[in-house]
């Protein structure tokens, strides 16, 4: 499974590690992904998703149903 948020599709970012002498080497900035069981009110059950912590914060404001509709995800598959 790819290291990608299932709601926001966030993935890792290419960046530079810059030393004191300003030499730059490529590195990857990984997404902070967590497995979470979230109560889905419309389905009356828990849904287990792999989410970024940014998506968890947005989830509290919008709700799981609205975020899934925006992402085009059918929560019955999870």
From Swiss-Prot:
SUPFAM superfamilies: L28p-like (SSF143800). InterPro entries: Ribosomal_bL28 (IPR026569), Ribosomal_bL28/bL31-like_sf (IPR034704), Ribosomal_bL28_bact-type (IPR001383), Ribosomal_bL28_sf (IPR037147). It comes from the Bacteria. GO terms for biological process: translation. One of its GO terms (cellular component) is ribosome. GO terms for molecular function: structural constituent of ribosome. Keywords: Ribonucleoprotein, Ribosomal protein. Disulfide bonds: none annotated. Belongs to the bacterial ribosomal protein bL28 family. NCBIfam families: L28. This is Large ribosomal subunit protein bL28. It comes from Synechococcus sp. (strain JA-2-3B'a(2-13)).
């Amino acid at each position: 499974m790819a290291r990608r948020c299932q709601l926001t599709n966030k993935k890792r970012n290419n960046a530079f590690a810059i030393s004191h002498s300003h030499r730059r080497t490529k590195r990857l900035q990984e997404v902070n992904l967590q497995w979470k069981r979230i109560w889905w009110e419309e389905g009356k059950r828990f849904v287990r998703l792999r989410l970024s912590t940014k998506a968890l914060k947005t989830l509290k404001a919008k709700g799981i149903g609205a975020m899934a509709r925006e992402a085009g995800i059918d929560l019955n598959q999870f």
